[in-house]
């Protein structure tokens, strides 16, 4: 389930209203210690409530950068600075682990620098690998080093890296995430019913393409 907080919180009735991750980042800018403490508390609360309802994990936290480009990410992201995202995500995941829940970082390798919404079209990020590596990949690399259990791929095309969108890309999943970053956890596709995934063909073809690229678990949600 997506139980991020803010505008993306699927369970609301009888669940605590969780703040958007960006509001945690704003507190962090004012007081680092209080921001990190709030991140950990929110991670614990989200996870504890879901666990009590019988759910094993949430697709959280968002590791994308908060930029002016992406309204679909926007306040779902902790911060604009990669280092701040990494520190806040580590605190949030520590709270989740206190509640005995695995974490899933998303949307690899970064959805924050495109304007299009992958729910309705395929976003295209024209940056080269170096620019992505120096910014968007920093939180993912940091969380892999911290032992995050899962990573969700993005339905975003990075044509200077691969002709396939990240969720269908062996370069992103096998070469970058697995070989270079040495991620050994579970790779999830994003929802294959999203418009951003339509380039994969029919649902069976989308599933085969995602599996062939290196995804371990596929989501078809709508």
Positions of PLM-derived features:
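Short acidic, glycine/serine/threonine-rich loops at helix termini
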Residues: 9-14, 69-72, 115-119, 162-165
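Glycine-rich anion/phosphate-binding loops
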Residues: 29-49, 80-88, 130-134
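Glycine-rich, aromatic-flanked loop segments that form ligand/cofactor-binding clefts
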Residues: 1-19, 39-65, 85-109
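Short coil/turn segments at secondary-structure junctions
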Residues: 27-34, 72-76, 120-127
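A charged helix-plus-loop insertion that forms the helical arch/lid used to bind
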Residues: 15-33, 79
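Glycine-rich, proline-tolerant flexible connector loops at the mouths of alpha/beta enzymes
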Residues: 62-75, 155-166
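Short clusters of hydrophobic/aromatic residues that line enzyme substrate/ligand-binding pockets
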Residues: 8-11, 24, 78, 122-125, ...
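Second-shell residues forming the walls of enzyme active-site clefts
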Residues: 84-222
């Amino acid at each position: 389930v997506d139980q991020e907080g803010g505008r993306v919180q699927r369970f609301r009735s009888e669940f605590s209203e969780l703040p958007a991750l960006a509001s945690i980042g704003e507190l962090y800018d004012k007081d680092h210690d209080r921001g990190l403490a709030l991140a950990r508390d929110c991670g614990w609360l989200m996870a504890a409530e879901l666990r009590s309802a019988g759910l094993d994990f949430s697709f959280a936290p968002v590791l994308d950068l908060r930029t002016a480009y992406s309204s679909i990410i926007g306040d779902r992201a902790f911060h604009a600075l990669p280092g701040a995202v990494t520190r806040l995500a580590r605190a949030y995941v520590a709270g989740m682990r206190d509640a005995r829940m695995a974490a899933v970082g998303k949307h690899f390798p970064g959805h924050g620098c495109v304007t299009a919404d992958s729910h309705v079209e395929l976003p295209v990020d024209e940056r080269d690998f170096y620019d992505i590596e120096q910014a968007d990949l920093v939180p993912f690399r940091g969380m892999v080093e911290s032992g995050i259990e899962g990573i969700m791929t993005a339905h975003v095309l990075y044509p200077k890296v691969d002709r396939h969108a990240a969720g269908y890309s062996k370069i992103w999943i096998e070469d970058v995430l697995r070989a270079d970053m040495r991620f050994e956890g579970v790779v999830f596709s994003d929802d294959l019913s999203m418009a951003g995934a339509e380039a994969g063909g029919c649902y069976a073809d989308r599933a085969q393409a995602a599996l062939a690229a290196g995804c371990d678990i596929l989501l078809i949600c709508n």
